[in-house]
Amino acid sequence: DGFRVDVIWHLIKDESFSDNPPNPEWHEGIDPYRAIVPLHTTDRPEVHQIIASMRRVVDSYSERVLIGEIYLSIERLVQYYRVNLSAVHLPFNFQLLLAQWDARHIARLIVEYEKALPEGGWANWVLGNHDRSRIASRVGRAQARVAAMLLLTLRGTPTLYYGDEIGMQDVPIPTER
């Protein structure tokens, strides 16, 4: 039991509500969210105080977990474990979800993540979620089976998006639904 907090790294904005600067690399055809550099609205230092207070509440109950959805580089992601592990128990590790599907690249990501984990930090791996195309749509059904085997044999907690275990692929959803 516990809580998964969506976009936990977005909880704090800078106090003057400054506009984010335009992304000079953005152009038509790229996700509109990427049109700005979220300098003032994500990964703010103050967010760690909020998360620490959430962690204290969760830790006041036995056997509970606090999970944070955090799309950041490994270097920034591991900061969400914090000193003395005072933040989320599991800052979702989306490296496999975002990686190009190449064995050497994935092997480097695994090693980099494991090396970056703070002492006592528990590894976790995510292959799919509601924000991205399903693994079978991204790499094909045969490779999705390989991906599931990788996910379930890596050290740490695996997160399997419902339907990925049967090779479910993306399908269009009619607007009337």
Q: Could you say what each language-model-derived stretch is?
A:
Residues 1-177:
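Active-site and adjacent substrate-binding regions of carbohydrate-active enzymes
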